[in-house]
A protein has these predicted regions:
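Charged, often Cys/His-bearing segments associated with DNA-binding zinc-finger transcription factors
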Residues: 1-35, 39-43
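Secondary-structure capping and boundary motifs in well-ordered enzyme cores
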Residues: 33, 51-58, 97-101
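An N-terminal domain-cap segment
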Residues: 38-58
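Short amphipathic helix-turn modules centered on a small-residue break
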Residues: 42-45, 89-94
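Alpha-helical support elements that line or immediately flank enzyme active sites
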Residues: 59-71
Length: 259
């Protein structure tokens, strides 16, 4: 009897895939143009003129890459950098005291979102990985993550960011953005990212999270009916029908930052 593939089984598969993190991150180290990206981000980063000296920009960029590639919350990526040898080596830290806390990581992510850099840099990462055949493309898991932002959030023009919105989740209201992601089922790596206001419904972003080569697509109850929408991707690039395997039970949306 074939065992039905559930989200818990998928999680187990992703955990096994991550045992090769060290080798993968060593490849990332060689192919990502860190100096170029630091130059792009620096004008938006803290100048360190008042208060405590900001964390090294390259360290924050490396943590950002880990967070986005492995779909980790602010607190989770902080703990992983502390606990995982592969992550700490990639970030160049050898003491927990060198690792920024979750709030600091969240504020850095907000800086990138507010200046339109999160998607730009992430898409460059995925383009590089795809050209190096470092991402498998058999199945995609779609999900979304809330990115909290202060109500005073401003964009690069110093105006109130109109892309940030409020949404009610359960009994709580959240203000900020939503990161919609497409995750490779086999490697656990995020291959597509779309940032919208927090009030954007999960299912509407589904086509933007697919690369077109998947045979199967997985999602929670927020994606019910995705295959029936007018803009649905029903066949992959090989002409085969994509199997939509949507879990009827709701998942708990992660809230990444409290800044």
């Amino acid at each position: 009897m074939n065992k039905q593939l559930t989200f818990s089984l998928i999680s187990d598969e992703l955990a096994q895939a991550r045992t090769s993190q060290k080798e993968f991150l060593e490849k990332i180290e060689r192919i990502i143009p860190f100096d170029e990206w630091i130059g792009i981000i620096r004008p938006c980063y803290y100048k360190g003129e008042h208060g405590n000296k900001p964390y090294d920009l390259e360290l924050m960029l490396r943590i950002f890459l880990l967070q986005n590639l492995y779909d980790l919350s602010d607190m989770k990526v902080m703990n992983e950098v502390i606990d995982s040898r592969a992550f700490s080596d990639f970030c160049g830290v050898d003491s927990p005291n060198q690792v920024p806390d979750g709030d600091t990581i969240g504020r850095f992510r907000n800086i990138l979102v507010e200046n339109g850099l999160q998607e730009k840099l992430f898409h460059q990462v995925i383009d590089i990985l795809s050209k190096k055949d470092l991402i498998l493309k058999r199945g995609t898991i779609v999900d979304s993550t809330l990115i909290a932002a202060p109500s005073s959030t401003k964009n690069k023009d110093k105006k109130r960011d109109k892309d940030a919105h409020s949404v009610k989740k359960g009994n709580q209201w959240h203000f900020g953005y939503k990161a919609h992601i497409g995750v490779d089922k086999d490697s656990g790596l995020v291959h597509h990212l779309k940032v919208t206001g927090a009030n954007e419904h999960d299912v509407t972003a589904t086509p933007d999270l697919m690369h077109g080569e998947e045979e199967e697509l997985y999602g929670d109850s927020g994606y019910i009916g995705a295959e029936k929408r007018e803009n649905a991707v029903v066949k992959n690039k090989n002409g085969r029908k994509i199997k939509y395997k949507i879990n009827r039970k709701p998942s708990t949306m992660k809230k990444l930052s409290k800044s």
